[in-house]
Each structure stands twice: as structure tokens, then as C-alpha cells.
Curated annotation (Swiss-Prot):
Span of domain tr-type G: 4-279
Protein task: Catalyzes the GTP-dependent ribosomal translocation step during translation elongation. During this step, the ribosome changes from the pre-translocational (PRE) to the post-translocational (POST) state as the newly formed A-site-bound peptidyl-tRNA and P-site-bound deacylated tRNA move to the P and E sites, respectively. Catalyzes the coordinated movement of the two tRNA molecules, the mRNA and conformational changes in the ribosome.
InterPro entries registered for this protein in UniProt: EF-G-like_DII, EFG_II, EFG_III, EFG_III/V, EFG_IV, EFG_V, EFG_V-like, P-loop_NTPase
Native source species: Rhodopirellula baltica (strain DSM 10527 / NCIMB 13988 / SH1)
The name this protein goes by in its record: Elongation factor G
Lineage: Bacteria, Pseudomonadati, Planctomycetota, Planctomycetia, Pirellulales
Annotated GTP binding sites: 13-20, 79-83, 133-136
């Protein structure tokens, strides 16, 4: 395969921007499917949405992967979910892509999930194009969307096309490089007709072209000089500089209406012209024997194989592992080593995926995205042809914010349910399962109500198990707010040798809410505590952080400075110092004025203007803090920060407040102190649960 002609791209966006519809048209125009299906309503549902639930709800839950050919280019296309509860799917697919298309709605513009996706693209330094979809909608305003790209995302965005006609009269686009008009004919827009720019758009097109060249001049001294001397910039130069600009962070903007079959083919051309091939990306692995040491990987088919498992799906035929190959070649029947588990596994079946259909292949080389059947691994694992060759850094996985108790209605279904939960846990790192020690309930936790609802629904459908679901529970945290000095002795005299440990130091609050935000610093001088006991002190403190003294929630934002202490030649041991650290924490943490922290969600609500007052009042009643509201073309977008505890059941409430016309998304913004009256309620509730559990 000629690597220059390979593109690994993702299609990312806010929910309901028409992303899956766009993917569907790309499959159709590249000849991969012969009939267009719509996302909602009758028919078979979109090709990329292959899970029953996705077809019903009209949202994309898991990233489907498929490959298409366009103008001699091989494009691996990943359709990612737009709903914030499925963010990890987006993280996973971006990690293995070389480029992306950010889809925006011509009316909604840059919405909360577009901002999240943008942040993820920046994290993985992914060059991208923007596509303004739904140009046929009332209120379509592409220039406003470009402004928002600049202001809200800080993107260097500029128009590469302008629209011909507006709203229901949208007919096509003007290409600002070729300076021609493209309109779309045939039953399904498959015929692209090139014509002259309509007379009434000539001036606007000239202006937009000047603005585009002006933006490109920031990436090329040559273009800058030609513009300054008022000379013509050749088309070849514009194409070349446009590609350099995209690889260096520029975002050219294309437009169309995927649903009305307009504007998709020019976008596909731009994908092949400007987005990077695997040869354009620098990829580094890490040396397993030295984490600090980077290893440059090259897309060379003859070098040792390095690939990353970025998605795992269990299907009736066993585990299906999606993999991106960064270096070397994999061959059917050969064995490769999982760098984490050090297990060697035979790749007996390699397939190229088209949504859930699969084509068997014998080998695959660098830059390709394929799936391997029947290997046992976890998402994020690196495979190589040799042991300890390289690991690819793992993906960023956000911490879960909501948990609920689940029980099978029929006792005999316990095994089936636990099999399903273990499978989902393997597929999705943001989904976890554990047993509550006090109540013995099975708890599942995830990124939001919809996230967990979908899994419960999948257990019902795929495993035939009816589930009883408890009320959602919030993952609170406990945190100190005042510095305290401690001086703690642990003495125990039993028959034979006793236990003795003495520690002195400070417990200091620090700004952080992640579960691993514990700092430990040892400043003991003169061997007052022998070096071999220090790790036991740190471990004692670290191990007790899982359950804080206020209400048994994890403790965060804590720093321990160990300053002094004493020991006994006979009675001191690692165990004694470990126990001392735990006893010290129990006694002194209460003196540090500990507070409960609660997850605060950043919520974006979109409602028809006439419901604005009702919805705003409801947000305030939920202890919400309004950050902005913006009304445009009869729709109001409200941004607010609301405690997670107050959002349960919000989807239903919003539907009834807005006659089914309101939509919302939310994601974790931060952990903040809980008001004292709420804190007292939570503690009382915990005590009640404990008493109930003890009975």
C-alpha cells in the first residue's frame, strides 16, 4: 500500500450535528454502500450505527470503523459518538487517527461537545478540517460559525468555500481555490456539476478568497511576498501551502448538507488533499525499561511490528480487537507479544472492518487500522513482534462521576449479569464494577446517566437479564481545608516483641481533586526514623485515603510532610510504622476541618426561546449557577454549572418542561465544596444506610 495515499480520519462533533449522516454519504459516494439509509425512522438505520440501540435512539454509541477508497486514496474512517457520556470512545479513536473532520451545525455552531472534542484533538495534536453541516436549515449562518471557531476554540479558521443559496434554497458551494461553483445533481447528489460562479456572488467570492490567502500567508513567506507585491498566487502553490497550513494547525472550513446530499464530495477531496498521511505524523513509543526514554517509530513495513489495541468489542464469535499499526507488518498466523502482560499471542484471523461486516485479510502494514479476532487484551495495550520493544503511551481516561446499584430480578441470572458487566468493563475503561463492602450491592459507575442506562439496556437485550436498578449515587470526595501538625505514637506491648512507631509532621491541604492527588514528602534528618521504614509510613497514609472519616468517601487534595519521629531497636518494624500512619490519619484528619467535595457538571441546555424562563428557574432551583445564555433564531442556549446530585432524571424533566423540544449535554467541570447544610444531609444519609446495612 502506498502510504502517501492512506488517510486515517475521524469524524467528530457535538450530538445531532449530522455526523453519522455525513459518514453514510461518504460511504455512498465512495461506492462502499449502494443505498443511503437515514439515522432515524424507517429502513435499516445508518450503516455505521450497527448496535440495535443506536438505530433506535439515533445516536452513535461506539465508534464504528470502516475503510473506503476515493480518487485512489485508501481512507480508514472512524465515526465517533457525539454524546458526552461516550467521551472515552472519542479519546480512543483520536489516539489512533492522523486527521479529523470536525462537524458543526450551521445553526448551533460551536456547542459544548465541540469544545470537548476540540480539547481532545489538541491533546493528540490532530490536524483537522471543519465541515459546517445542515446548510439547508432555517437560520444557517456559516460566517457566524467561523467566528465561533476563532473565538471559542481559538482556531485559525477560514472559509475554503462560500455557499450558493441559503437555507431551503441552498444549492451548492463556491470553491475559493479553483474559483468555480459546484452544484449537486442526480437522485442522491452523486453528480457534481462544475459551473461558473453566479454573478451575484462574484464579489463575495473574491473577498473570501483574499481572506483565505491572507490566512495562508501566515504559513508561507512565499505567499506573503506575492500578496505584498500584489502578484497572482498560483493554484498549485495554494494547494501546497494549504496542506502545510493544515498540518501546522490551520482549520479550513467546508460546508454542505449531508442529509440533502450536497457538499460531501468536495469535503472528501479536501480530506485526501490536506489531511496527513501516516508518513506526515511523528509517533513516539516509550522504552519499557526506561519510561523517560522515547523511541521514534517509523511507518516502515520491514521494521519490527508495533501496534496499539484501541478498542475491544465482544461479539458472538469472540473478542474483536481494533488495532492501529504504527510500524512493521503483521501476518496472519504469526505470534506477537502484548507488552503489558508479556503474553505471546497468535493472530489467527485479521479482518478489515466495514461497520460490523468484515473482510478477511492475510497481512497489514504500517498506517493501517484493522481488527484481530480472538486475542485476549485490554484497551490501550501495545503489541510488538519482540518483548520489551516499546509501549505507546496510554490514552487519557476520565474518572467516573456516577454510580448505581444493579441486581438481577431473577436470582438465577446472577452469573449472566456478572459476565455482561465484566465484558463491558473490558470494552470501556470509564465503566467500572465493584461490590460495596457495607451493603454487598453490586455497583456500576460511569460518565453519566445515559452511559449507564445504555449498559443496563444492553444487559437486557444481549443477555436476556432483567435488572433492578437502584437510585443513582454521587461520587463525593473528602478534603482537608486547614493545615495541622501531628505527633503520633503507636505502642503495643504483647507477649514477646511489641510494636513501636512514632511520627511527627504536617498534614497540608493542596488544590487537587483527582483520586491520586496525594503528596508525601519525607524531611526526617539524622536517621530519627530509619530509611527502611519511610515507605511503610507513606503506604499507611496512602492506603487509608480510600475511605475518609467524614462519610467514607475517598480523600483528595492532601499532602503529608514527615518531619521527625523515633523508633525502637527491637519493637519497631514496617508493620508498626504502617499502623502508626493509619492511626495518625484517623486522629488528625478530623482536626483539618475536612469538607465534602461534590462533582459540579458543566451543562449546556438548548431550548426554544419561550421556555427560557421556566428552564432557567429550574436550573437555579437545582443549586445551579448560570454562566451564560444566548438566544439566536428562536433558540436559547443556556450554559450553567449544576451539582451532579441535582441532575438525576433531568432528561425527563427537561422534556416535560419544553414539550419534548429541549436537549442538553453535560460533563464534569470540577469538584467543589458542598454547602454545609447539604453536607449534613449527606452524612446523615450515609449513617442511615450503614444502620440499614448492619441490620
Amino acid at each position: 500500500m502506498n502510504l502517501e495515499k492512506v488517510r486515517n480520519i475521524g469524524i467528530s462533533a457535538h450530538i445531532d450535528s449530522g455526523k453519522t449522516t455525513l459518514s453514510e454519504r461518504i460511504l455512498f459516494y465512495s461506492g462502499r454502500i449502494h443505498k443511503i439509509e437515514d439515522v432515524r425512522g424507517g429502513g435499516d438505520g445508518a450503516t455505521m450505527d450497527h448496535m440495535e440501540l443506536e438505530k433506535e435512539r439515533g445516536i452513535t454509541i461506539t465508534s464504528a470503523a470502516t475503510s473506503v477508497t476515493h480518487n485512489g486514496y485508501h481512507i480508514n474512517l472512524i465515526d465517533t459518538p457525539g454524546h458526552v457520556d461516550f467521551t472515552v470512545e472519542v479519546e480512543r479513536s483520536l489516539r489512533v487517527l492522523d486527521g479529523a473532520v470536525l462537524v458543526l451545525c450551521s445553526v448551533g455552531g460551536v456547542q459544548s461537545q465541540s469544545i470537548t472534542v476540540d480539547r481532545q484533538m489538541k491533546r493528540y495534536q490532530i490536524p483537522r478540517l471543519a465541515f459546517i453541516n445542515k446548510m439547508d436549515r432555517t437560520g444557517a449562518n456559516p460566517r457566524r460559525v467561523v467566528e465561533q471557531l476563532r473565538e471559542k476554540l481559538g482556531a485559525d479558521a477560514f472559509l475554503a468555500q462560500i455557499p450558493i443559496g441559503a437555507e431551503e434554497n441552498f444549492r451548492g458551494v463556491v470553491d475559493l481555490i479553483e474559483m468555480v461553483a459546484y452544484t449537486f445533481e442526480g437522485d442522491q447528489g452523486e453528480k457534481v456539476v462544475t459551473g461558473e460562479i453566479p454573478a451575484d456572488l462574484k464579489d463575495e467570492a473574491e473577498e473570501a478568497r483574499v481572506a483565505m490567502l491572507d490566512s495562508l500567508s501566515n504559513y508561507s513567506d512565499e505567499v506573503m511576498e506575492l500578496l505584498l507585491s500584489e502578484e497572482e498566487v498560483s493554484k498549485d502553490m495554494i494547494y501546497r501551502v494549504m496542506r502545510e497550513a493544515v498540518l501546522n494547525g490551520a482549520t479550513p472550513v467546508y460546508m454542505g448538507s449531508a442529509y440533502k446530499n450536497k457538499g460531501v464530495q468536495p469535503l472528501l477531496n479536501a480530506v485526501t488533499q490536506y489531511l496527513p498521511s501516516p508518513l506526515d505524523r511523528e509517533i513516539y513509543g516509550r522504552d519499557p525499561s526506561d519510561e523517560e526514554k522515547k523511541i521514534e517509530l517509523s511507518p516502515d513495513p520491514d521494521k519490527p511490528f508495533v501496534g496499539m489495541a484501541f478498542k475491544i468489542v465482544e461479539d458472538p464469535f469472540g473478542q474483536l480487537t481494533f488495532m492501529r499499526i504504527y510500524q512493521g507488518t503483521i501476518k496472519k498466523g504469526e505470534a506477537y507479544t502484548n507488552q503489558r502482560s508479556q503474553k505471546k499471542e497468535r493472530f489467527s484471523r485479521i479482518v478489515r472492518m466495514h461497520s460490523e461486516k468484515r473482510d478477511e485479510i492475510d497481512e497489514a502494514g504500517p498506517g493501517d487500522i484493522i481488527a484481530v479476532m480472538g486475542i485476549d487484551c485490554a484497551s490501550g495495550d501495545t503489541y510488538c513482534s519482540e518483548r520489551d520493544y516499546a509501549t505507546l503511551e496510554s490514552m487519557y481516561v476520565p474518572e467516573p462521576v456516577i454510580k448505581i446499584a444493579v441486581n438481577p430480578l431473577n436470582r438465577g441470572d446472577g452469573d449472566k449479569m456478572s459476565k455482561a458487566l465484566q465484558r463491558f468493563r473490558k470494552e470501556d475503561p470509564t465503566f467500572s464494577v465493584y461490590t460495596d463492602e457495607e451493603t454487598n450491592e453490586i455497583l456500576i459507575s460511569g460518565m453519566g446517566e445515559l452511559h449507564l442506562e445504555i449498559y443496563i439496556e444492553r444487559i437486557r437485550r444481549e443477555y436476556g437479564v432483567e435488572i433492578e436498578v437502584g437510585a443513582p449515587k454521587v461520587s463525593y470526595r473528602e478534603s482537608p481545608t486547614r493545615e495541622v501538625e501531628f505527633n503520633y505514637k503507636h505502642k503495643k506491648q504483647t507477649g514477646g516483641s511489641g510494636q513501636y512507631a512514632h511520627i511527627v509532621g504536617k498534614l497540608i491541604p493542596i488544590e487537587s481533586e483527582s483520586e491520586d492527588s496525594f503528596e508525601f514528602e519525607e524531611k526526617v534528618v539524622g536517621g530519627r526514623i530509619p530509611k527502611q521504614y519511610i515507605p511503610a509510613v507513606e503506604k499507611g497514609f496512602r492506603d487509608i485515603l480510600g475511605k475518609g472519616p467524614i462519610a467514607d468517601y475517598p480523600v483528595v487534595g492532601t499532602r503529608i510532610e514527615l518531619l521527625d519521629g523515633s523508633y525502637h531497636d527491637v519493637d519497631s518494624s514496617e508493620k508498626a510504622f504502617y499502623t502508626a500512619a493509619q492511626g495518625c490519619f484517623r486522629e488528625y484528619f478530623k482536626q483539618a476541618a475536612p469538607k465534602l467535595l461534590e462533582p459540579i457538571m458543566s451543562v449546556e441546555i438548548e431550548v426554544p426561546e419561550e421556555f427560557q424562563g421556566t428552564v432557567t428557574g429550574d436550573v437555579i432551583r437545582r443549586r445551579g449557577l448560570m454562566t451564560s445564555n444566548d438566544t439566536n433564531e428562536g433558540m436559547t442556549v443556556i450554559l450553567a454549572e449544576v451539582p451532579l446530585a441535582e441532575t438525576f432524571g433531568y432528561a425527563t424533566d427537561l422534556r416535560s418542561m419544553t414539550q419534548g423540544q429541549g436537549t442538553f449535554t453535560m460533563e464534569l467541570a470540577a469538584y467543589r465544596q458542598t454547602p454545609s447544610n447539604i453536607q449534613e444531609e449527606i452524612i446523615a444519609e450515609r449513617k442511615k444506610d450503614e444502620l440499614a446495612g448492619a441490620r
